[in-house]
């Protein structure tokens, strides 16, 4: 019986799961909408909601806690300067999950996880050219 087991393992080690959710959290904060499998989206939502609740109180301690979770300085900055003030008056429920059909290769259920009141222009926005691309252009 699997009574009182919280979360899913996703056939990954604990370190791999932690890194996966850190990367997915950073991607969601960056693009404000990502497409992933439904179980991953369901497990990602509480992680991101707690981060946004941290972002509502801008303090050094909260920034360090967020940095330990996300591990991306630019996304922590966006969390505290853009997302925190945006959801200051909302008591919770910062993300929504919408089902998006099934993946072609393995028929896995897919979902779109996005922020409520999201910035539509942030979707698909890249961080800019990399050092390799600028070296190739020169």
Swiss-Prot record:
A Pfam family it matches = Ribosomal_L17
Q: Name one GO cellular component term.
A: cytosolic large ribosomal subunit
Give the GO biological process terms: translation
Sorted alphabetically, the keyword list is: Ribonucleoprotein, Ribosomal protein
GO MF entries: structural constituent of ribosome
Protein family according to the UniProt entry:
Belongs to the bacterial ribosomal protein bL17 family.
Q: How does it assemble?
A: Part of the 50S ribosomal subunit. Contacts protein L32.
Report what the protein is called.
Large ribosomal subunit protein bL17
Give the originating organism.
Answer: Methylorubrum populi (strain ATCC BAA-705 / NCIMB 13946 / BJ001) (Methylobacterium populi)
Q: What is the lineage of its organism?
A: Bacteria, Pseudomonadati, Pseudomonadota, Alphaproteobacteria, Hyphomicrobiales
